[in-house]
Amino acid sequence: MGKEERYTKKPKPDDRSDNVEKLQEMIHNTIENYREAEDYLKLHAEELSPEEIERIKEKNRNRLISIQNMRQEIIDEVHDRERR
C-alpha cells in the first residue's frame, strides 16, 4: 500500500450499535479474570513472594475499577440510545 493510497481511504463510520454487548462481554471476562486471580492467591499464596501477591492484588483492584467504568459506560450508551 503506497502513501497516497493509505491517506485516501475514508474512515469507517462510527458504529456503536453493539457497544453495550461488547462492554457486557468485557465485564464478564474481567470478572472471570478477577475470580481466577483470587482463586490462584488462595491456592498458592504461601508459594508467592510478597511482591507477587501485591502485584496480583493491585491488578484485581484495577479490574474492579475497570468494571465500574465499563458499567457506567453501559449506562451512558443506553441513555444515548434513548436520546436517538
UniProtKB/Swiss-Prot annotation:
It comes from the Bacteria. It holds the Pfam family Tlp. Residues 1-20 are annotated as: Disordered. Belongs to the Tlp family. This is Protein Tlp homolog. The gene is tlp.
